[in-house]
Amino acid sequence: MKIVEVKNLTYRINDFEILKNVTFSVEEGEFVGIIGPNGAGKTTLVRILVGDIKNYEGKVEVRGKIGYLPQLHQVQREFPITVKEFAAMGMYGRYRKIDWEKVRSTLKDVGILHKENDPIKNLSGGEFQRLSLARALLSDPDILVLDEPEAGVDEMGKASFYELLNRLRKEKNITVIMVSHDIGMVFKECSTIMCLNRTLHCHGPTETINPEDLKKIFTDFDIWIRGTRHYEIYHGRERD
């Protein structure tokens, strides 16, 4: 079932086209990685999907509830609030009374229950991303939308976060749409890749994406995907 459907999406600021005639769909259960150079319209697309931007042209249908993880720098982390209180914000608007057992269970799922009473400002980048994931999960989403979740997180933290994300999306049957600058990680983790450069440059299952198409807009593409199975396939080591 198509859980997201976008047709002929165009978005302008004054006369400048940020997105032009973008058409795609997302099937339920997919893990979609959105890549593209700086200024390609990736974050704009995410903001349209989550409803932050309304004045676009075209058709956007989202058939399910979205849980959203914005970029790390967009979240004010100096508020005097604890980890469990921040996570519980994902339940606001759904319950008159916070289900603290559910909050604690979700914090346990993402591996930070031991931090539940700590101020959020004391968390590392990786820990805060896990907390943001917990908050999004507490809204009981059908779709998780993530905007550069690896930003500000070290390599070990990235690998751990993606392992967690993949496990939870399978357990909870959640569709994931993720913007990332870490192209190697996208090719390793995502089932589907969408490359934006204001228009839709290419889109399809990860194994069908041709590196030659991406090299037109990513000069260091081979470096970014080196070590992934995709790199081995397209450099002749698995073609037989």
From Swiss-Prot:
Residue ranges of every copy of the ABC transporter domain listed in the record: 4-223
Keyword Hydrolase included in the entry's annotation: no
Key words of the record: ATP-binding, Nucleotide-binding, Transport
Entry-linked CDD domains: ABC_Metallic_Cations
Annotated positions binding ATP: 36-43
Any GO MF annotation of the entry: ATP hydrolysis activity
Keyword Transport: yes
Protein name per UniProt: Probable metal transport system ATP-binding protein TM_0124
Origin species: Thermotoga maritima (strain ATCC 43589 / DSM 3109 / JCM 10099 / NBRC 100826 / MSB8)
